[in-house]
Amino acid sequence: MEFMGQKVLHIGETGKGASFKMLVNAMLAQSMLIFSETILLGEKMGLDKDFLLNVIPNLVVAAPFTKAKAEMIRQEDYEVQFPLEWMHKDLHLATLTAYENDQPLYLANLAKELFANAKKEGLGRLDFAAIHKFLDGKR
């Protein structure tokens, strides 16, 4: 386990780690969506795309993973690290689990639909950062 990450967390009994991973991926998917929407709106407002991709990932409010995803967006190269279709699966599992536990996940449900539509457009086997390509309409 140590070679896979910087820190190994003991979450609890069997299955709790998978549950935690599902939660983290739901947060990751939603963070990718807001990052992409922010870049796209900034461009529509006349801000330079390279400026946005250089500055936003370094803001205190940005998730650290956006630095790597910014480069994918810049190069329009979505070589898979974590497939969009797997992100959709994790969002589906998270929203299903939320339903079963009577806990609404309004934004995760919306994210699930966006990732499903991107998958239908043929982006499923690309990295989940390809959601940017879907939101941009360049397919």
Where are these regions (language model features)?
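Helical "substrate-binding/catalytic lid" subdomain
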Residues: 16-138
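Acidic-glycine-rich active-site phosphate/pyrophosphate-binding loop
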Residues: 1-14, 64-70
